[in-house]
Regions:
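Membrane-interface alpha helices of multi-pass inner-membrane proteins
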Residues: 172-195
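Transmembrane-helix motifs of polytopic, lipid-linked glycan transferases
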Residues: 94-118, 158, 310-313
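Membrane-interface micro-motifs in multi-pass membrane enzymes
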Residues: 67, 71, 117-164, 186, ...
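Short hydrophobic/aromatic helix or loop-helix immediately within or flanking a transmembrane segment
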Residues: 45-51, 64-87, 273-288
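Membrane-interface transmembrane helices that cradle and orient dolichyl/undecaprenyl
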Residues: 53, 156-172, 209
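Membrane-interface helix-loop-helix junctions at transmembrane boundaries of multi-pass membrane enzymes
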Residues: 2, 8-9, 118, 206-225, ...
């Protein structure tokens, strides 16, 4: 049998090969775009966590994490990357590129669904195309920066793919429950975007079966089981995190602003901010795009946003009708996440886009699944091909921009050259310098103007004077937000006059002849 004949008889081979090639190309494109963003201490701290896991501390004993653990997706991936590449700033870019390439491919696969032939291709390319070229500034920051909700989309999309492709068997709800637990251990976003969405969609289908169709339990047991599995997964995720800590593992604090409702008086402001953040997610924001080229790209992304909105509206129209299970879950997940964002405390400019990131692939999948067929029947593939080519051009434009130097790399080199390897600094100068230096210089973050150790994305032993030492403090003159974190006058009042002081660019390095950890306030969180 010839190779072409083999492909005709086994088209899945062609699909698999195409996905592999597309994934590889997308990875290198997103790696190059990720390098245009200035790395800071947030992803650097998570890279250090993965380094500790790789070096004999898989439970991260003694670590203070953020309110998102990233323990299910990003940290394991980072461990693998660092096993191969070592502890380097490039690790963050590699992770971000791998994650986003996977999200784009999974979005395309989920949009394709069970469709075959031309319609299947149109569905996949339509959905994947909407995600294809994140905008250069905010798109890179929100989607290709490093650990920040995007990785959580992987278990969520895989769960929905399972629901889409698996037969209605008893074992599917059990696996779905495990996968939902996995996602929620990684990030609470999965509770709203996945667990609650599956529970709502399955509950609606059960009610439809009983009230509208008069079906018996023998026919609606599957959706009832999915709803129960989704609800159990919420408790299971909390139990897993608690058991990890009980076993001596990391401490993850509760969400910063809790799960309560924000005052209704601020609702108009939050709706406006949510709208701006949605534009950022889809690359259609104009506030950070000063050139004619980038403004044109923002206009182009408005087309993708319009298709996503149409897909969501089509999904809403069929939600209580004959929509399939995955479509109902996507609609429910989109509405739940948007409602949680608008009515909760997390809808802040730019950073709030992270909190609703699932809206991007969910609405793109809805566009692919619900608009792909009509567009194919209308023979609009040439128009879609032109749009896809424009998006590829936008991605190429992003990849030609200058590579950014990680923040404070000059400081890391200066400190190492002067044999200053263990000190204190503001948060934005702390873990990024540690990563910049490959771990040879360690800066522990301070808060309280320079008096208190910050218990966030750090090993508690770094600030324990019984086992660690710090003999200098770094302050900065600018930017003002960083300068206010550690104030020289407050440092002198708490730690006394330094033995000597160095000035290097915007940095002031105050060196002492004793262990500063003996005078720094050290909070006790999680028993550490």
């Amino acid at each position: 049998m010839s190779f072409s004949g083999l492909l005709r008889r086994h088209p899945r081979i062609l699909w698999a090969a195409g996905l592999a090639v597309a994934g590889l190309v997308l990875y290198f494109c997103y790696l190059r775009q990720a390098q245009t963003y200035v790395l800071n201490s947030d992803p650097a701290g998570q890279a250090l966590e993965a380094w500790a896991m790789w070096h004999g501390n898989p439970l991260l004993r003694g670590w203070w994490l953020g309110d998102i653990s990233f323990y299910g997706v990003e940290l394991p991936l980072n461990v693998i990357i660092e096993m191969v590449n070592g502890l380097r700033t490039e690790d963050v870019h590699i992770l971000a590129a791998l994650v986003y390439a996977a999200v784009v491919l999974l979005t395309a696969l989920l949009a394709r669904g069970t469709a075959r032939g031309r319609e299947g291709v149109v569905r996949a390319l339509l959905a994947g195309g909407i995600l294809l070229a994140p905008s250069l500034v905010y798109g890179t920051r929100v989607l290709i920066q490093g650990p920040n909700h995007t990785g959580t989309l992987i278990p969520i999309l895989l769960t929905l793919l399972l629901l889409d492709r698996a037969p209605e068997r008893w074992w599917v709800p059990a696996i779905v429950g495990v996968m939902l637990t996995w996602g929620q251990v990684n990030d609470p976003l999965a509770t709203f975007a996945a667990a609650a969405a599956v529970a709502v969609a399955s509950g609606v289908r059960v009610l439809q079966g009983i009230v509208r169709d008069g079906r018996t339990a023998r026919t609606w047991w599957y959706d009832a089981s999915l709803a129960v599995a989704a609800l159990i997964s919420v408790a299971a995720a909390h139990l897993v995190l608690a058991e990890i800590h009980t076993a001596g593992g990391f401490y993850a604090p509760p969400p910063k602003y809790g799960y309560g409702l924000a005052p209704l008086s601020t609702l108009p402001t939050r709706i406006h901010v949510a709208g701006s953040n949605i534009l950022m997610l889809f690359g259609a924001d104009f506030t950070s795009e000063p050139t004619a080229a980038t403004k044109a790209l923002a206009v182009l992304h408005l087309v993708g946003l319009a298709l996503a909105v149409l897909g969501l509206l089509a999904g809403l129209r069929g939600f209580l009708g004959r929509a399939d299970r995955v479509t109902q879950a996507l609609v429910a997940g989109t509405i739940i996440v948007l409602a949680a964002g608008v009515f909760g405390h997390y809808m802040l400019p730019v950073v709030g886009a992270h909190e609703i990131v699932s809206v991007l692939p969910f609405s793109a999948v809805l566009a692919g699944r619900l608009l792909g067929g009509p567009l194919t029947r209308a023979r609009l593939e040439p128009v879609l091909a032109i749009g896809l080519a424009c998006y590829l051009g936008a991605l190429a434009y992003n990849d030609t921009q200058p590579i950014a130097t990680p923040a404070h790399q000059d400081l890391a080199r200066w400190l190492e050259a002067h044999h200053l390897t263990s000190g204190l600094a503001g948060y934005w100068e702390s873990t990024i310098v540690t990563l910049d230096s490959g771990g040879r210089v360690r800066l522990v973050a301070l808060i309280g103007k320079g008096t208190t150790i910050k218990p966030y994305e750090a090993d508690s032993s770094w600030s324990n004077p019984a086992v660690s030492r710090a003999n200098f403090i770094v302050t900065v003159k600018w930017p003002l937000a960083d300068a206010h974190q550690v104030r020289p006058a407050v440092v002198r009042a708490r730690f006394g006059a330094p033995a000597r002081t160095y000035h290097f660019r915007e940095y002031r390095i105050m060196v002492y002849n004793y262990n500063l950890l003996t005078r720094a306030t050290r909070p006790s969180l999680g028993g550490y």
